[in-house]
Amino acid sequence: MKNNKGFTLIELLVVVAIIGILAAVGVVAYNGYTGAAKKNAAKTIHANLIKYVAAEYSKCTIDDSDTIMKKGGTGGVGCSTTDDAGNVTFVTATEIVTHLTGTDTPLEDKNPYSTASAAVRSSTSAGAGFVSITATSENLITVLTCFTDGKTGNECTDTGNQLTNTISID
């Protein structure tokens, strides 16, 4: 009688089929995890922007900071300006939004859905992962963030997939 060593063709096919099933389940689970991570990253960028603007603006009122929102110690927005007549004008929401969405912005967050793009932009339309910041009046900044789980089309029109906050600059 021969002493056969090794696996039969059927045994090998069963192992390959099991590995295929495990791989398929793993890919679906991985996509769910990455979708949730992107959604949470967009929410975190939104919350951090609100805290950043509030903290930086409070520097104008707490101490005598001349400039806020600097990048690497340079640039920024002046807390106030004084004209030749001695009239003081304080920083407006429009100046803050223009600075935060310009080329000299201190913000370095990337859109979690498209890492080639900056997360914060000045726009009234929200694409997935973008934090849209607009000056809605002289003293109000509106922050709108859209996120999606990627299961359907553009879910940014669904208010359940948006965060909206208003920051008052007084």
Which stretches of residues belong to each language-model region?
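Extended, polar beta-sheet/loop recognition surfaces of beta-rich domains
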Residues: 39-64
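Periplasmic/extracellular, small/polar-rich flexible segments of pilin-like filament-forming proteins
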Residues: 55-170
